[in-house]
Structure formats: structure tokens, C-alpha cells
Amino acid sequence: LASDFILLVAKKEEKMLPANVVKRELDERIESLEQKENRKLKKTEKQTLKDDVVMNLLPRAFTKNQQTAVWIDTENNLVHVDAASSKRAEDALALLRKSLGSLPVVPLAFANEPSTILTDWIVQEKIPHWLVALEEAELRGSQEDSVIRCKKQPLENEEILALLQDGKKVVSKLALEWEDTLTFVFNEDCTLKRLKFADAVREKNADILKEDYAQRFDADFVLMTGILSKLIENLLDEFGGEKVRLG
């Protein structure tokens, strides 16, 4: 816990059993039992055997551990999940909800349509002064499969501008740099991907000895959440605040 911020880590442990290993063991048991009893096993009997095979193999299975950080901003009533996919984020929130008994949260949505704002930034060259557009974007058409991905390409390119000005495409993803502090990809669903802090930020707490892991961890958490909170505040202001939900 730091100030108004709470950090939690959800840990998921999975036992990895290759399907072919289970099938081979199951086939051997079915064949052995059918020969012994001189009859074909019923579907329910095969399922019972399969359950038994899985239970016997589990102690020898590989274990896959997955950790998902959840940062709660109690002042602004926001829950941030560090996850590469929405499924992983939902799993972490489901665990938190189960632990608390209740967790009435919904994905953050801005009042103004993000793709419209992102497109205006590029077409009208009116990106906020605290942001720099990098040479990476995704342009989306009206059809789901109509996507153009731009990388290492100036977005003021005439062909790109023509597509945006004609309304054939909108900017659905845009790589940005915020105040020489952080780079990230902003998505039209309001998620931030590929966050990377500048070296100057990463080295700010370098004076804390590596051996003092807890102190360094706490200092980094306070520093980075402070930066992200300010960024999110800027984005909320630029996109018209949080969308009002009816009902």
C-alpha cells in the first residue's frame, strides 16, 4: 500500500498435461480392461477411466505459474490490470471479486470516441503538447478485416492522410511518447499496450542498493504509479472524461 494506491498480485498455477500423453495412457487402460472383461466399455466408463488417468498423471505434470499485477487507485476509483490479454485481466478481476465478495467494475470508456480523436490528431496536426506521435499506427476501415498497420513510417505520409481525410480509415491504435517519460501504444478500446519507461525514470531509484529489494520495489512502485496516474489524468481530460453509463 502506497498513499492511495494498493498493489496486488494474482497468481495462477496450471498443471500442464499434454493431451497425447493422456490419450496414450487412456487407450492402454481401455484396451487392457476390454480384453480382460471381453466387452466394449461404455462411454461413461471411459470417462471415469480418463478422470482416473488425469488424477494419476497430475503429480508428474509440469507446472506453469502466471502472475498478474493489479493496481488499485482508491482516490480515483480505478483498477489497473497489467495483463497482455483481456481474458487474463478478467481472470485476475474474477479472483479479486471472489476474494472480496463483490467488485462492481466496468472497463474504462471515454466520453469522446477515441478513434475519432486519434484520427483528428493526425489529420489536423493538433496532438496535445504533452504527447508525441511515434511512427507506428493501425488504421481501421468499416470492415473488421480492413486494417492497415504502419510501422517506422511517418504518419504525415500523403497516402495515409488521404485515407484518413476521405473517411475510409480511422486511427484505431497509435504509438505515443508522453513527456519524454514513457512510450506506449494507445488502443481505441482505451487500453495501453507496450508501456516502456524512459531510462532516466528507470534509473531514478538506482541509489537504492539492490540488496534492499523491498525498499527499491516500493520506491519504483510509487514512482511509476505516480507517472501513470498523471498520464491517465491527461488522457481523461483530452478524451472528455469518463463516459457516463446509463442505468
What residue ranges belong to the model's regions?
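Intrinsically disordered, low-complexity, charge-rich terminal extensions
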Residues: 1-247
